[in-house]
Amino acid sequence: MDAQITLTTGLDEFLIRSANDLGIEINFKTESIRDANENYLSIVTVASANTQLAMYPAVEVLNYRGRLAIKPTDLNEDFLESLLVQVNLSAKNSSRDGVSTYIFSLSGELIEVFNSITIESLWSLEFARTSIFENALRAAHQLPLGRPDLKSMNWLIMNFDAPRILDMKQPYKHLFAHEPGYRIVKAASHSGYVALQDSEDLFKRVAHAVDYLEGAISE
């Protein structure tokens, strides 16, 4: 049996879609959602049994009223390189295959390592050459890993989870009329993420979309 992939509850639909795109079987289990830190950095690695390692760039994660906004970080390059070296050494010294999610404070302190696909991996579905979800599947099936590098350096993505009583059709029409560049992708009827790239005021625009989808604002 292929290796089992662990991921946060609510992300399984994205893993299933990636498996369908690859035309391969899937074996996974979910774990509960954890409380997020205020603002922090995330670096993800995917290791396969055939000694391949894909290390994704550091991204910055911002907490917005319980939702996570993820974007490329503009912190000092030497500082970020030192974190990547630390993660690379840790991954190579580990005998574990699969996904590892490293959480760092903005000052570089290692907070925790999760051996699973977490919500911090959402960004890769839109802005990595090969998503973390796809590479996790490739590693589980001992297939060659894809490229983890960024496709763009100007983007932001945020998750949403709207009350089930809300109608979701009208908000979509309203948002796309005001910003055709939105990517609104659902994991279920009332949850998913909003992504936007190559635009000014990315945080403001994406936060507005999430607020509107969740009924926090009406215009």
Q: Language-model features: where?
A:
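N-terminal glycine-rich anion-binding loops that anchor highly charged ligand groups
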Residues: 1
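Active-site "cap" helix and flanking loop/linker of ATP-utilizing ligase/carboxylase catalytic domains
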Residues: 86-101, 116-162
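Structural motif
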Residues: 4, 26-28, 53-56, 111, ...
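Electropositive phosphate-/nucleotide-binding environments in soluble metabolic enzymes
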Residues: 9, 77, 81, 97, ...
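A short beta-strand motif that forms the metal-chelation/ATP-contact edge
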Residues: 108-117
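Peripheral (often C-terminal) accessory segments that flank ATP-dependent C-N-forming ligase machineries
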Residues: 11-14, 18-19, 31-33, 138-219
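A short, polar/proline- and glycine-enriched secondary-structure boundary/capping micro-motif
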Residues: 65-70, 121-125, 205
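Internal nucleotide-binding/catalytic subdomain
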Residues: 5-6, 10-98, 104-108
